């Protein structure tokens, strides 16, 4: 009888503990002019985009989360941006314990996985809105480049985006709602999307986003963060003294210059997420090996060849070996 009673008490305590954690964990993210405040202190995003897919796979996996978090902490990362929600309390708890916060991204049509189209994103917010690791709710990822996903009319996306943001505010008033836009939006769109509290911008303007920051200063008073920025570690052509082929120096140099611009303009921008933490070998061909793949040279503003080789963007490689840019980011994030 005593054993049964003890087990019953343990069960009750565990349930109460779980409810206490989910109900009473306090985090409040506010906006003050162009800044994010976490529990009344300014929070400057020093982040990486995080989409960990293992060698030989095409699906996200957190099997290496412990190793990854250790590397992130060493690099001074305080924020990760994920492209779809993490539905695993144990993973969220590990991220929180590491002192890292999450920008949770929701897609429009993810076949019902916490997406906007089905409305299931609301269930995720209800489930995890009190988790200390979550910094921002982010809707979409540069969908403005893809009107074909919205019956050929990008305004269909903007309407869905603004409505989804409104629904989030009804569920969780403790965090801002953002979106990740491809390049800078115009003033009219910012005004139209009045439920968006802050803007993330995916920006690839060579190694100098300073013009974009000045543009933002003139069109909006809302907080801005660079939701994607950076460079890959492969040169499709020889250019500017950087040799063709894998070139970690080119990546390191570009990221250093980009980060300098961000930290030197911290009165305008509220942070940056370097794209990305680990190489994605699933993107351009055989997921069992690293493939060269990207657009033709000079077709986009990616330093220093204009070609975004999709499988070479990590600050670490697929085996978690540090690239040269890792030390650059570590220095900048830990000393700013």
Predicted regions and their residues:
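A structural motif corresponding to the C-terminal end of an alpha-helix
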Residues: 75, 127-132, 164-175, 261-269, ...
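Bacterial Sec-dependent signal peptides at the C-terminal "C-region" and cleavage site
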Residues: 12-28
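A short, compositionally biased
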Residues: 28-34
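Active-site mouth of glycoside hydrolases
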Residues: 36-205, 209-210, 217-221
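Soluble or luminal CAZymes and related metallo-dependent hydrolases
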Residues: 64, 116-120, 156-160, 208, ...
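Active-site clefts of carbohydrate-active enzymes
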Residues: 144-150, 220-262, 274-286
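N-terminal Sec-pathway targeting helices
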Residues: 1-11
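Aromatic-rich peripheral "rim/lid" segments of glycoside hydrolase catalytic domains that contact
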Residues: 275-336
């Amino acid at each position: 009888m005593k054993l049964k009673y003890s087990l019953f008490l343990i069960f009750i305590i565990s349930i109460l503990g779980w409810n206490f954690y989910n109900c009473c964990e306090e985090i409040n993210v506010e906006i003050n002019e162009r800044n994010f405040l976490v529990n009344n202190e300014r929070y400057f995003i020093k982040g990486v985009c995080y989409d960990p897919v293992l060698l030989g796979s095409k699906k996200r996996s957190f099997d290496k989360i412990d190793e990854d978090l250790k590397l992130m902490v060493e690099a001074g990362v305080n924020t990760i941006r994920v492209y779809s929600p993490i539905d695993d309390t144990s993973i969220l708890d590990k991220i929180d314990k590491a002192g890292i916060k999450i920008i949770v991204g929701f897609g429009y049509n993810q076949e019902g996985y916490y997406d906007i189209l089905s409305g299931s994103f609301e269930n995720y917010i209800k489930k995890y809105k009190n988790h200390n690791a979550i910094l921002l709710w982010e809707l979409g990822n540069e969908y403005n480049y893809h009107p074909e996903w919205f019956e050929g009319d990008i305004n269909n996306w903007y309407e869905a985006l603004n409505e989804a943001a409104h629904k989030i505010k009804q569920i969780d008033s403790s965090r801002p709602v953002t979106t990740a836009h491809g390049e800078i939006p115009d003033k009219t769109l910012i005004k139209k999307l009045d439920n968006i509290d802050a803007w993330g911008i995916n920006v690839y303007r060579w190694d100098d986003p300073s013009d974009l920051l000045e543009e933002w200063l003139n069109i909006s008073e809302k907080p801005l963060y660079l939701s994607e920025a950076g460079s890959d570690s492969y040169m499709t052509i020889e250019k500017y003294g950087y040799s063709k082929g894998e070139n970690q120096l080119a990546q390191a140099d570009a990221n250093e210059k980009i980060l300098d611009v961000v930290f030197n303009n911290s009165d305008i921008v509220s942070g940056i997420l370097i794209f990305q933490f680990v190489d994605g070998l699933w993107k351009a061909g055989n997921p069992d090996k690293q493939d060269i793949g990207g657009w033709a040279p000079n077709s986009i503003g990616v330093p220093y060849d204009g070609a975004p080789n999709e499988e070479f963007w990590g600050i670490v490689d697929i085996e978690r070996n540090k690239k040269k840019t890792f030390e650059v980011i570590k220095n900048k994030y830990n000393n700013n």
